[in-house]
Curated annotation (Swiss-Prot):
Ranges: WD repeats: 246-285, 290-334, 463-504, 513-554, 560-593
Record Gene3D superfamilies: YVTN repeat-like/Quinoprotein amine dehydrogenase
Gene: UTP18
Task performed by this protein: Involved in nucleolar processing of pre-18S ribosomal RNA and ribosome assembly.
Any one of the GO CC terms: 90S preribosome
Name of the protein: U3 small nucleolar RNA-associated protein 18
GO BP terms in the entry: endonucleolytic cleavage in 5'-ETS of tricistronic rRNA transcript (SSU-rRNA, 5.8S rRNA, LSU-rRNA); endonucleolytic cleavage in ITS1 to separate SSU-rRNA from 5.8S rRNA and LSU-rRNA from tricistronic rRNA transcript (SSU-rRNA, 5.8S rRNA, LSU-rRNA); endonucleolytic cleavage to generate mature 5'-end of SSU-rRNA from (SSU-rRNA, 5.8S rRNA, LSU-rRNA); maturation of SSU-rRNA; RNA fragment catabolic process
Subcellular location: Nucleus, Nucleolus
Iron in keyword set: no
PANTHER family documented for this protein: U3 SMALL NUCLEOLAR RNA-ASSOCIATED PROTEIN 18 HOMOLOG, WD-REPEAT PROTEIN-RELATED
Phosphoserine found at: S182, S184
Source domain of life: Eukaryota
Positions of region (Interaction with UTP21): 101-190
Length: 594
């Protein structure tokens, strides 16, 4: 009895940690359940619904939101357990509309990029790693063709895939039935809006093709040209034409495109550069380096019979010249410049030591009425050799007495759809010959410049010239003015309509504003301005008003940054004046009158 009482009085020690853990594993406990119930928050379950409600309430304040949350929490106490859960079937219509709007914004951003297409956006499966991968595109010649900018060296995987696809579709065109009609109509509308804008992205490889393929042309301001005031010229300086990529040598030659806002420059750095002239940025469109060929003369040429046939002719002090084909067919199907070399004169090599001085003109066959281009080369011993602009074959030659110093081209309309091409050449003694190239170089007349000694330049103006060519046969006009420059700086100006019937015509004016050798003579397209310049000294350039023959007094000024002028060019519309100098810069001015 005593032993039993003693056993009952012995206290049982509480379970240690190991026993509690073992009992928990075997029998379980309510600790975890109680803790989870204490931490239970119904807001977590209804988080998506609350977010939708908050998105729909645009004008609610923070205090209002807090009151609504408390009200919702109070209502949850009276909700049955089976109503605390719901089947997610994609959300309500309002949230879907908002998501669709958000996706539309993203799609618009993606569509602004040239590398993203609708096919990539609607792809069934997209690998997110494609955007992280960087693919070098300068390793091989094949990948270099995928560049859209000269500044690119690496692109991500998405751009790489899209460019490979576009390159494939150039070879194997995409069938029309693949695209939806609505998509094709939208694309056509976008193309119509962009047509004529001529906005060039800096470094765009296809910029030249885009500009030449647009229908934008210079405005025809010559037909409605008003008379210039004789004393003051409204002129404003623009950004230098080659500010983005200046030349490494003097600008020896300038040429505006006959119909597009393009300017061609060339010099002894052996590089042709084409700039898109907008007066603000003047981006470089493309450039071409000719190894071992310093450039003395370069010019654009557009065929009268086929507007798509366009070339750039260039030459230096070498026994050959180059022709760069700019036809859209060649530029579209190949990223390599197509350049031909003219060097053979077929028995007349002794009369042509250098191809550096040349001009390009139009010649009409009197029998077939077909029109083709010709290249006129200033040779030695008084010769001028004439080549076919397409084949380079020697067609004819014209010879004068003495040493030829310069020549120019004039046109004479005969009847509707017919014209004559006249070659005017001068020697150092001021003796002038005029040849009819339609009659195999027949001499029309010969006359002498009054007081002409040491003649250096001759130029016609007021009609169709080599620097301002016509794009249609009906637009060809005979030139009214003829200017002759000399080593002493004198420039004699003749009116071809009145004073060219005698063998000793009298000039309408003798301009003596310059005192050094005349190196440039250029007329504005409408013949109201004569620009004369000398490269011997700085700032030796003057603009002469015609027909008053007075020099504009307000320009250039002592602060005009001309430098030593090496080349001058007017735009076909007459609204721009480009001046190249020995520093390799092309100054640009806008003539507000035009």
């Amino acid at each position: 009895m005593t032993m039993a009482t003693t056993a009952m009085n012995v206290s049982v020690p509480p379970p240690d940690e190991e026993e509690q853990l073992l009992a928990k594993f075997v029998f379980g406990d309510t600790t975890d359940l109680q803790e989870n119930l204490a931490k239970f928050n119904a807001d977590f379950i209804f988080n998506e619904q609350e977010m939708d409600v908050e998105d729909q309430e645009d004008e609610g304040s923070e205090s209002d939101n807090s009151e609504e949350d408390e009200a919702q929490n109070g209502e949850l106490d009276h909700v049955n357990n089976d109503q605390l859960f719901f089947v997610d079937d994609g959300g309500n219509e309002d949230s879907q509309d908002k998501n669709e709007d958000t996706m539309d914004v993203d799609d618009e951003d993606d569509s602004s990029s040239d590398d993203y297409s609708e096919d990539s956006e609607e792809a069934a499966w997209i690998d997110s790693d494609d955007e992280k991968i960087k693919v070098p595109i300068l390793v091989t010649n094949k990948t270099k063709k995928l560049r859209t900018s000269y500044n690119e060296s690496k692109i991500n995987g998405v751009h790489y895939i899209n460019r490979l696809r576009s390159q494939f579709e150039k070879i194997y065109p995409r069938p029309k039935w693949v695209d939806d009609e609505s998509d094709s109509e939208l694309d056509d509308e976008e193309d119509d809006e962009e047509e004529g804008s001529n906005n060039v992205i800096n470094g765009d490889i296809n910029a030249l093709t885009k500009i030449l393929s647009t229908t934008y042309n210079y405005k025809d301001t010559l037909s409605n040209s008003k008379l210039l005031p004789p004393k003051k010229l409204d002129i404003v300086r623009l950004k230098d034409a080659n500010a983005s990529h200046p030349s490494h040598s003097a600008i020896q030659s300038l040429s505006f495109h006959p119909s597009k806002p393009l300017l061609l420059t060339g010099g002894y750095d052996k590089t042709l550069r084409i700039y898109h002239i907008d007066g603000k940025t003047n981006h470089l469109v493309t450039s071409l380096h000719l190894v071992g060929s310093p450039i003395q003369t370069c010019t654009f040429y557009t065929s009268l019979s086929n507007q798509n046939q366009q070339n750039i002719f260039t030459a230096g002090r070498r026994r050959y010249m180059h022709s760069w084909d700019l036809s859209l067919e060649n530029l579209t199907h190949s990223q390599t410049a197509k350049i031909e070399k003219f060097s053979r004169l077929y028995g007349h090599e002794s009369t042509q030591r250098s191809f550096e001085n040349f001009k390009v003109a139009h010649l009409q066959n009197s029998q077939t009425n077909s029109v083709h281009g010709i290249v006129l080369l200033q040779g030695n011993n008084g010769w001028i050799n004439i080549l076919h602009s397409t084949s380079g074959l020697w067609l004819m030659g014209c010879k004068i007495e003495g040493v030829i110093t310069d020549f120019c081209i004039d046109y004479q309309p005969i009847s509707r759809g017919k014209f004559r091409t006249i070659l005017i050449a001068v020697n150092a003694y001021g003796e002038v010959w005029e040849f009819d190239l339609n009659k195999n170089g027949h001499v029309i007349r010969r006359w002498k410049d009054q007081g002409g000694v040491g003649i250096t330049k001759i130029q016609v103006g007021g009609g169709t010239t080599t620097t301002c060519p016509a794009l249609q046969i009906s637009k060809i006009k005979q030139n009214r003015w003829l200017a002759v420059g000399s080593e002493s700086g004198f420039v004699n100006l003749y009116d071809r309509n009145n004073a060219m019937t005698s063998s000793t015509p009298t000039p309408v004016a003798a301009l003596d504003q310059l005192t050094t050798t005349i190196s440039n003579l250029q007329f504005s397209p409408d013949g109201q301005i004569l620009c004369m310049a000398s490269r011997a000294v700085k700032d030796a350039l003057r603009l002469v008003h015609l027909p008053s023959c007075s020099v504009f007094s307000n320009w250039p000024t002592s602060g005009t940054p001309l430098g030593k002028v090496t080349s001058v060019a007017f735009s076909p519309s007459g609204g721009l004046l480009a001046v190249g100098n020995e520093q390799g810069k092309v100054r640009l001015w806008k003539l507000n009158h035009y």
